[in-house]
Amino acid sequence: MSQRKENSGKIINISSVGGKIYTPMGAWYHATKHALEGWSDCLRLELKSFGIDVVIVEPGAIKTEFDVAMDYQHETTATGPYGELKKKMIKVMENAYKPGNYSEPQVIADVISKAIRSRNPKTRYAAGKMAKQVLMGRNFLSDKGFDKMIMRMVDGPSSN
């Protein structure tokens, strides 16, 4: 409310490149990030006339405790009908989060600071390891092409 009265301000939402892509066993995560992206886009349009900027930060691979959520999901799906797929996805995630394959959280803090200081911030900031590359790949490929790319990562190069 005070931002509207001041006719200026910034709202910065932390999403993920996961708000633009999708992976097997990730519906729970990707759905929340897709929703945050859509909500932020709508909010940006609604608040523009009040001088309020809405910014989305889309981190790539960042060193966090995301693995705790993944461990819980593994416990609940490892022996069911999705067990084999889940095991493959665990390997993909383990590879993605090997040392050197992720960025430190400070990268995101720096981007947030940049957006706050900017007089005219971007609507989106992709930051962290692989963020820009993942988003560029998603924009370049058709849905079916992206599906094939993801499944090659999961199943290996011989997958269809």
Question: What residue spans do the PLM features occupy?
Answer:
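Active-site loop immediately N-terminal to the catalytic Tyr-X3-Lys motif
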Residues: 21-28
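Residue(s) in the substrate-gating loop at a strand-loop-helix junction
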Residues: 16
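C-terminal beta-strand-loop-alpha-helix "lid" module of Rossmann-like NAD(P)-dependent dehydrogenases
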Residues: 48-99
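Active-site-adjacent segment of SDR/Rossmann-fold oxidoreductases
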Residues: 21, 42-52
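Rossmann-fold scaffold of SDR-type NAD(P)-dependent oxidoreductases
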Residues: 13
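Core catalytic loop region at the nicotinamide-binding pocket of NAD(P)H-dependent oxidoreductases
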Residues: 54, 93-140
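A short helix-coil junction within the Rossmann-fold of NAD(P)-dependent oxidoreductases
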Residues: 1-7
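Active-site helix of classical SDR
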Residues: 32-35
